[in-house]
Amino acid sequence: MTQVVVGQNEPIESALRRFKRQVAKAGIYTDFKKHQFFETPQEKHKRKEATRRRQRSRRR
């Protein structure tokens, strides 16, 4: 879980920027987008296969 402690003289904008950076680094937003809709086993298999193909082509 991402947590940001706001300092006494720290502006809210900088704390919000730090929070957004930590969320992006932890991959929380991408995980949320991935689980937002139900994915059938067939769709999951297609997505994983496409990822494998993409990674294989990058290695060459």
Swiss-Prot record:
Gene3D superfamilies: Ribosomal protein S8
GO biological process: translation
Entry GO MF terms: structural constituent of ribosome
Homology family: Belongs to the bacterial ribosomal protein bS21 family.
Pfam families per UniProt: Ribosomal_S21
Species annotation: Synechocystis sp. (strain ATCC 27184 / PCC 6803 / Kazusa)
GO cellular component: ribonucleoprotein complex; ribosome
Compositionally biased intervals (Basic residues): 44-60
Alphabetical UniProt keywords: Ribonucleoprotein, Ribosomal protein
PROSITE patterns: RIBOSOMAL_S21
Residue ranges of coiled coil: none
Span list, region Disordered: 36-60
Protein's UniProt name: Small ribosomal subunit protein bS21
Keyword Nuclease assigned: no
